[in-house]
Swiss-Prot record:
UniProt similarity note: Belongs to the chorismate synthase family.
Pfam families: Chorismate_synt (PF01264)
UniProt gene name: aroC
Keyword presence, Amino-acid biosynthesis: yes
UniProt protein name: Chorismate synthase
Catalytic activity field: 5-O-(1-carboxyvinyl)-3-phosphoshikimate = chorismate + phosphate
Pathway annotation: Metabolic intermediate biosynthesis; chorismate biosynthesis; chorismate from D-erythrose 4-phosphate and phosphoenolpyruvate: step 7/7
Organism: Cupriavidus necator (strain ATCC 17699 / DSM 428 / KCTC 22496 / NCIMB 10442 / H16 / Stanier 337)
Gene3D superfamilies: Chorismate synthase AroC
GO CC terms in record: cytosol
Cofactor note: Reduced FMN (FMNH(2)).
Classification via PROSITE patterns: CHORISMATE_SYNTHASE_1, CHORISMATE_SYNTHASE_2, CHORISMATE_SYNTHASE_3
Cofactor(s) the protein needs: FMNH2
Amino acid sequence: MSGNTLGLLFTVTTFGESHGPAIGAVVDGCPPGMALTEADIQGDLDRRRPGTSRHVTQRQEPDQVEILSGVFEGKTTGTPICLLIRNTDQRSKDYGNIVETFRPGHADYTYWQKYGIRDHRGGGRSSARLTAPVVAAGAVAKKWLREKYGTEIRGYMSQLGEIAVPFTDWSHVPENPFFAPNADIIPELETYMDALRRDGDSVGARIEVVASNVPVGLGEPLFDRLDADIAHAMMGINAVKGVEIGAGFDSVAQRGSVHGDELTAEGFRTNNSGGVLGGISTGQDVTVSLAIKPTSSIRTPRESIDKAGNAATVETFGRHDPCVGIRATPIAEAMLALVLIDHALRHRAQCGDVKVDTPRIPAQAGQTP
């Protein structure tokens, strides 16, 4: 199986399976000399960790990260950083009834057809459990971007099923299990999820991610555009079925006189571009929106086939997220960080000494550049 590595200069290769002894990532290309400990990584892993509320899978994994290499006396050495997370709460017997059948909407069928073998225990390599090492690697990238450029990457849930979540303030996001930026809507979301779990069904979600203080100039036209690489990475997250940058599909209904972000000496007037023009960052906030499909492992009986091609009925039991989008916010943040650090290092290598007389204007009119 190929396709396990993301990035060009700052690369992340993940390994492991959902019910194997451990999962992890090897981060290569991290600049040397950055202070790094497990504590720098653990915070984001705890945000993604399962079993933290009744609205997510009840699989109890501590997700304690171990740094096995690439750090000496508390600082990165520039050599590969191996991050290990041990699996401790596998319950493989829950998957005994799908050894010979394929879950509708899951990768069971495609993995079997492609490889002729599949690990049915928790989905094996196709499990959302494999987003944990991505979050760990993303925490390393976040730290470097923050220290080098002051870049901050934050995300929130803007929709759960058919319920829109209006944005009120960032301060609400860490205060609830949904990463919702609105405290008033939490009771409605909880009632909705409780009913969904009773019904044995699942639902999708929409996640927004914003990177602020992004340097101007990241991205390589034509085929290594920053927004193209962001979309590529985000589509690598389990269950993501759509990605928008900036105004996204709303651009279709906008006129050019509205969509084009006007530049003034005081800054950009709008940010319909999502912080990327011509595949290159503008210095504005990079804004990304993700559509996440409903979880495929549900108790509701559904039609399928077995390995022999015979008709079968599939019911999935065990501990599953009724909405994988609830824990997707730190994953999306990590993916954005991994793309940004890779392009930052590439930009520094090729264009680090480029100087122009035109001043950098603020990301938004009225702000300081």
